[in-house]
């Protein structure tokens, strides 16, 4: 049985988010194919996540023990490390993703939990895990220098040791003349297909 962490980062309501229409379809199909797996949904806008402050640094760099697992910040890092698979759903905002997702990544980027420092440099601790990034974008950003969200996520997940990463991108949703409903449906089809083997 696998533990799946479904991270959602969009301030829009469920029915309004084009990203969530695709990611929720992915999750539903995954459940059908993996009924024994545990799926934990983490809607970042419903969590008490903020930008790190000076007082938080002691928690991040302090002792990692049983008591620290209940820490208001470190609990997210432990939860992240405990998962086997990750579904990260976030739209492209200003060539990246919503700032709350970066704030969350700062919460889970903790030495001794998701990576460690060695004499040879940092080493990821989350090996043999997999992730999928589901993103909706207003324009066409495949292989574009303006695309920094998916590129960053792949880099930081790789830093944690996660190498098996897929991306489902629904592009050109804000381009005049594009059939948005059709584009989203294409994204859902891709999501369902990938969920069967994730």
Curated annotation (Swiss-Prot):
The keyword Mitochondrion does not apply. Its cofactor is FMN. This is FMN-dependent NADH:quinone oxidoreductase 2. Gene3D superfamilies: 3.40.50.360. One of its GO terms (molecular function) is FMN binding. Its EC number is 1.6.5.-, 1.7.1.17. PANTHER family: FMN-DEPENDENT NADH-AZOREDUCTASE 1, FMN-DEPENDENT NADH:QUINONE OXIDOREDUCTASE. Binds 1 FMN per subunit. The lineage of its organism: Bacteria, Bacillati, Bacillota, Clostridia, Eubacteriales. The keyword Oxidoreductase applies. It comes from Clostridium perfringens (strain 13 / Type A). Belongs to the azoreductase type 1 family. FMN binds at residues 136-139. The gene is azoR2. Keywords: Flavoprotein, FMN, NAD, Oxidoreductase. It comes from the Bacteria. Pfam families: Flavodoxin_2. Homodimer.
């Amino acid at each position: 049985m696998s533990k799946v962490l479904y991270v959602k980062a969009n301030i829009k309501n469920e029915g309004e988010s084009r990203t969530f229409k695709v990611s929720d379809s992915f999750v539903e199909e995954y459940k059908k194919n993996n009924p024994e797996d545990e799926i934990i949904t983490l809607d970042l806008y419903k969590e008490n996540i903020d930008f790190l402050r000076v007082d938080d640094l002691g928690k991040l760099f302090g002792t990692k023990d049983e008591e620290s697992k209940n820490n208001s910040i470190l609990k997210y890092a432990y939860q992240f490390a405990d998962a086997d698979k990750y579904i990260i759903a976030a739209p492209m905002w200003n060539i990246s993703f919503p700032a709350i997702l970066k704030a969350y990544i700062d919460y889970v980027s903790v030495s001794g939990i998701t990576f460690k420092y060695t004499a040879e440099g940092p080493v990821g601790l989350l090996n043999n895990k997999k992730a999928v990034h589901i993103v909706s974008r207003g324009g066409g950003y495949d292989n574009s220098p303006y695309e920094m969200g998916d590129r960053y996520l792949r880099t930081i997940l790789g830093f944690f040791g996660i190498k098996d990463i897929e991306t489902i991108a629904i592009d050109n949703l804000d381009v005049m003349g594009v059939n948005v409903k059709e584009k989203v449906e294409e994204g859902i089809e891709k999501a369902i297909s990938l969920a069967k083997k994730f």
